[in-house]
Amino acid sequence: MPIRIPDQLPASDVLRNENIFVMSESRASTQEIRPLKVLLLNLMPKKIETETQFLRLLSNSPLQVDIELLRIDDRPSKNTPEEHLNTFYRQFELVKNRNFDGLIITGAPLGLVQFEDVAYWQHLQNIMAWAKAHVTSTLYICWAAQAGLKLLYNLPKRTREEKLSGVYYHDIHKPFHPLLRGFDDRFLAPHSRYADFDAEFLAEHTDLDILATSDVAGVYLAATKDKRNVFVTGHPEYDAYTLHGEYVRDLGEGLNPAIPVNYYPNDNPDNKPCASWRSHGHLLFANWLNYCVYQQTPYDLEKFSEANFTKDE
């Protein structure tokens, strides 16, 4: 949330240059606040588990956020009761004529599937195209980040030879960028993907701000100049045991998975894993809600227009 200070206080310019949200007394006197409208497009198989993880992160903010859950299509789910989907999830047809402050598109276990072979690929393209004219800021997670880069920049699908699984250190590159507000210089975050996000490749083929990278995992966090599209290639929403569940699942399927890196104490799967990324996940989502959504979105969503947004250089 912003701090309110006298209009001409000398500290205001210093703080604004550090991308700290400073509100003058004159602006505060006319400020209008309403709940933020955020749409969560849940592509993960275990939808109840995933929605809980994201709601946990979205709740850690003084801003009131109204969440609506969106399903990609009406195909039956193998891992979520149909009653749950019918009760709590909306079809795109029911929301497409409305505007939203934020959209989150989750990951999906489709790392080795070509985009054109994804059953709902056309539906996803339609939703991403719709978001450009109806959503202030979209947050793409893991596989969705790769899909978003394909649709927005026509980047080819790049796949690693071995699955990336574990908790990795990342370095920040633009310390005064709003999304990095309060970040440590180095932080931990989990990854579970085949997708390859090479920093040099993204820098050469896009105009994205590359905000955080890992020597092993590549680009972790990037955003368009106007902050309307934010790409997170890892899984900051994961619970302590999510990577463990995936590891055990892959073992059971005979895939001979590698032990997730920097996850189990002493790299022993018999030991209880430690969630070393929890504070990072909460901070990332709080920053996205504050700087990319709340400070950018119009008070009256009916007046939403792409023309309201400029690309900050």
Swiss-Prot record:
Pathway: Amino-acid biosynthesis; L-methionine biosynthesis via de novo pathway; O-succinyl-L-homoserine from L-homoserine: step 1/1. It is found in: Cytoplasm. Coiled coil: none annotated. Substrate binds at K163, S192, R249. This is Homoserine O-succinyltransferase. The gene is metAS. Keywords: Acyltransferase, Amino-acid biosynthesis, Cytoplasm, Methionine biosynthesis, Transferase. It is an enzyme of class 2 (transferase). Belongs to the MetA family.
